Amino acid sequence: KVGHVLSAYSISKVNMELWRWTGIDRNKRIWIGGMSGAAYQTVIELLDGFSSEWGWSWADFGANMLGSSTFVAQELAWNEQRIQLKLSSHKKIYSDESLNFRSDKIFGKNVPERLLKDYNAYTYWISVAPKSFFPKSKLPAWLQVSLGIGAEGMFGARSNIAKDKFGNIIFDRSDIQRYRQWY
């Protein structure tokens, strides 16, 4: 769900900046930017709703709204993003060749596909610049205090078992624990 929050937040932020170039009123561009992030993510969620593999998720929809709301609330309150949501990613290479094969199959072989699909390689960050809350302090403006969350051991949507169209198991790594980790 963190990915939904981050996506809606980021899309809202980019769209508000695009609307800034048009010269429209500050409040209008904040709201249009925020609604753009929410609308874009809602369209994706609607498409998921018609997919037999995914289906509609109220939790995903709520996370989308939270991401856009986080952006809008900060812009309206502070005219800046004091609490920023960020993403880092890298291509994972496993010592077990079967995991590399499975990763190539479900996440893709090239970097853009992997950046989009491989949750094992993501770390989501929430970063706060203390100086923005305490402007008279001697803290450096560049300092950010961050908390990150990532996941490991995910080689399928809901489990580490994959079946072909006939229901035959073609990949079974139920021995690999799926877990979250904090940074």
Predicted regions and their residues:
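Hydrophobic alpha-helical membrane segments
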Residues: 1-183
